[in-house]
């Protein structure tokens, strides 16, 4: 990518009322010997965010392999800029010992008018919940 980050697997965006409300960036799941690569990517994001927004409101000093727990995520850095929150998480998968980062960029300045779900959106949401449930049930 243009900022020198190598491990991005996916970028998802969420909109409400045509406003971008959330960006989710997720890395590939990689093995323990490459945790440094994940941290390096996160630090590149932090450098870029800091240039744009100033220092994070929270940042961990260093990451130790012992801080990872199966199936859990922890905050590596967080920015609070007005209505915007940027959270950088590191985590370990529960089923296999693989590690990843996630970055959430959220904008809380939601439009005031309440969004009424269309039938299509309702069905879509039900389908997603059902899929998530099936994935959970089939993964054990």
Regions found by a protein language model. Give the residues of each.
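N-terminal leader/targeting segments
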Residues: 1-17, 126-140
């Amino acid at each position: 990518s243009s900022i020198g980050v190598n491990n991005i697997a996916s970028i998802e965006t969420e909109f409400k009322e045509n406003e971008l409300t959330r960006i989710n960036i997720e890395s590939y799941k990689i093995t323990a010997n490459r945790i440094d690569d994940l941290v390096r990517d996160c630090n590149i994001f932090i450098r870029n965010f800091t240039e744009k927004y100033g220092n994070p409101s929270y940042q961990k000093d260093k990451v130790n392999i012992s801080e990872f727990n199966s199936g859990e995520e922890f905050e590596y850095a967080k920015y609070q800029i007005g209505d915007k929150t940027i959270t950088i998480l590191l985590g370990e998968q529960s089923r296999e010992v693989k590690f990843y980062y996630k970055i959430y960029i959220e904008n809380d300045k939601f439009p005031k008018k309440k969004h009424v779900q269309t039938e299509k959106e309702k069905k879509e949401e039900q389908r997603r919940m059902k899929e998530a449930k099936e994935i959970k049930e089939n993964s054990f």
